[in-house]
Amino acid sequence: MPEQDKDPRVQENPDDQRTVPEVTGDARSAFWPLRDNGGPSPFVPRPGPLQTDLHAQSSEIRYNHTSQTSWTSSSTKRNAISSSYSSTGGLPGLKQRRGPASSRCQLTLSYSKTVSEDRPQAVSSGHTRCEKGADTAPGQTIAPTGGSPRSQDSRPRRRKIPLLPRRRGEPLMLPPPLELGYRVTAEDLHLEKETAFQRINSALHVEDKAIPDCRPSRPSHTLSSLATGASGGPPVSKAPTMDAQQDRPKSQDSLGLLAPLASAAEVPSTAPVSGKKHRPPGPLFSSSDPLPATSYHSRDTAQVTSLIPATFTAASRDAGMRRTRSAPAAATAAPPPSTLNNTSGSLLNAVDGGPSHFLASATAAARAQRSEVRYNQRSQTSRTRSCLKRNASSSSSSHSSTEGLQELKRRRGPASSHCQLAHSSSNTVSEDGPQAVSSGHRCENKAGTAPGQTLAPRGGSPRSQASRPHINSALYVEDKAISDCRPSRPSHTLSSLATGASGGPPVSKAPTMDAQQDRPKSQDCLGLVAPLASAAEVPSTAPVSGKKHRPPGPLFSSSDPLPATSSHSRDSAQVTSLIPATFTAASRDAGMRRTRPGTSAPAAAAAALPPSTLNPTSGSLLNAVDGGPSHFLASATAAARAQRSEVRYNQRSQTSRTRSCLKRNASSSSHSSTEGLQELKRRRGPASSHCQLAHSSSNTVSEDGPQAVSSGHRCENKAGTAPGQTLAPRGGYPRSQASRPRINSALHVEDKAISDCRPSRPSHTLSSLATGASGGPPVSKAPTMDAQQDRPKSQDCLGLLAPLASAAEVSSTAPVSGKKHRPPGPLFSSSDPLPATSSHSGDSAQDTSLIPAPFTPASRDAGIRRMFRVRNCLRGLGLFLLVFSFFFLLTWASFSF
């Protein structure tokens, strides 16, 4: 056996994967390979007699194994081993037994090959298993590639002469080459699967006869399949048309459980209730939802038409829907019946119900969207007086009259088509989100509709909050600002930007003047931005200098949080934009000219600004529109304040030509008496009411902060009042420093610049930007030329702002020379360091007096140069230490080694 293992007589051909079994005993092989390189080669016979005295069992094993491999060979070369070692006994009987069914033995070839090398008995057992496998599945045959297995009659007959001689010692006669078989490939298995599928399809072909035509079936098909869940037979659609019903056999219905549903669906509905169109199902019913066992019988999606009996045609249904409209234009709004979806259910549950097995969240969302679509369609078709009739549930007093609205629509012309555009786009956009509902419902009054209330639609029947959860939540955000079909006021945009809630898209702004006068001023319900809305409601006619009121721009954004003190951090320079419409620029100039000494015309009192708009502590009317919180960008704030400062300074310096407060008091005591103050009030007339209001509020506000105190005591002369001295108020009794610690500290900052009640220079805007402190809203002043000449120039105490002060002092005489006050430019920003007394700067115009004169730019440059020298010295010292440490380490390393 070991010698035979080393003998390379046993070879394997890679082409047909044939293995030559081992030969036991001393028998020699009659063949040798044509090449010795191990490549694929046939065996050729060796000269000499063949030893035929082999064991019968070995001969049988060799025959069984070679007969298996010969059938799977694809080459045309002859198999010499099987022909030479096969015995004549039992060969015809084996061929007859194998027959056509022997092709199934090829499946176990891989197993028999591997086992045959170790145990030759496994080959015979595997071959026996293959022979028995041909009879295991009667009636089933494997379809080969050619289409049918080869039978014995199709092969050429083998010779009946025995191949091997019966006597020993005679030479072996080689038989003719055997006819090779074929392999079972993946294509054969695929054909077998296709055959099985065809058999199944042929069985299902009987069921396909139940479908009469390609027209849509009723939605009750989906309802029945959903109701049963796992029905044995598919529900069949009923009654698409009259003639089709007559031709169709009536014995197709096999679901007895759905008989009541089918009978209910057969009953024709006389007309759609309240003229509603069939809702599109939205995302509730989609093809991605899992269907029951009978889901493969689903028909086309446009199957709703077949639910209506033949006598109830689409034309009659459209006519009924047109009768329920309020205008003939409703006929065009009805979609064609073929676009309706069958998956929305039958007439029993098509509108709002939906199957019970769907999720509640999806059902609520789908209902909300369907309600939006129907609601938009009704509002689209009801064009007659749709924007005039107001909902009874909303506040009717907060809306403008219908006559004013019609007049506005006639004046506005093509711009009034905004409602139509919103309605036309609401049908498509409403599928995306609740925001689109706001555009569709713009013509309806929804003010005051809380989430817990009910909304009365146009159809007349109220829908509860449970049936419209998303619509009411979306409308509640919007009903605070939108009240009619006209473009909403600028307060809508301001409020949405200030609060950060953009419930509805902002609409175009600024309707005409008379339309605004007709509109009540109580329409705004957003508490935080109510002053904003009322301020933006009144259009500013234009400042005297001809400049338009600037748009909010980037100052108002929904991403900026509003600080808690934002209502008191504005500049009183914003009064220009808050002038009512009837208060024109001409009347204001006339009033300012008539209120000078010697005049007390009644028109001046009417033309004067309202006291509430002048008081810095009055709230958001002074600081809501233009100032912006302190955290807004400094560049935008500086530009806005500079423009307003120029406008006010130019107009006040031009109109205040009469020397209202000519007398100056350098000793700071002339204006402290009550007589001088009364004389000043008599000269200034009604325009001096600002000082009175400030005084009346100073007693209460002075306890809250020094900012209000400074504005309250503005008409008193406080120059020269040191922190340690006492201040004599109007009451006549002195107040000590201990009783008024914060007041004196605030007045000490203020008394260097304020000497009368006239408007101060426009440098207050520059200084307030430089200090960055908005402690109290400064009140604008405007001194004249002679007053500026009389003012001493030694009032400075903030060293850092010396260059700023010099620039502001030069530009203060600009109105006399006809030049406008220059804008501050980028010199002043909120990022500059704040001085210690910045919180006490009640009037931003007073910061000019806080600049010390001795501190020049040259001294500041010298300090910068000293800093550079110190830095260079430190760098040199660090470099020296680094070099020294390097040499020290080098020396230590040299000594250590």
Swiss-Prot record:
Chief site of localization: membrane
Residues that span the membrane, as ranges: 877-897
Biased composition (Polar residues): 54-65, 77-89, 103-114, 219-228, 376-385, 417-430, 490-499, 556-579, 650-676, 689-702, 762-771, 828-849
Subcellular location: Membrane
Composition-biased stretches (Low complexity): 66-76, 599-612
InterPro entries: POM121-like_prot_1 (IPR043220)
Keyword RNA-binding: no
One GO cellular component term: membrane
Keywords: Membrane, Transmembrane, Transmembrane helix
Entry keyword annotation includes Iron-sulfur: no
Residue segments, region Disordered: 1-177, 211-252, 266-302, 315-348, 362-469, 484-522, 536-612, 642-741, 753-793, 812-856
Biased composition (Basic and acidic residues): 1-19
Bilayer topology annotation: Single-pass membrane protein
Family: Belongs to the POM121 family.
Protein name: Putative POM121-like protein 1-like
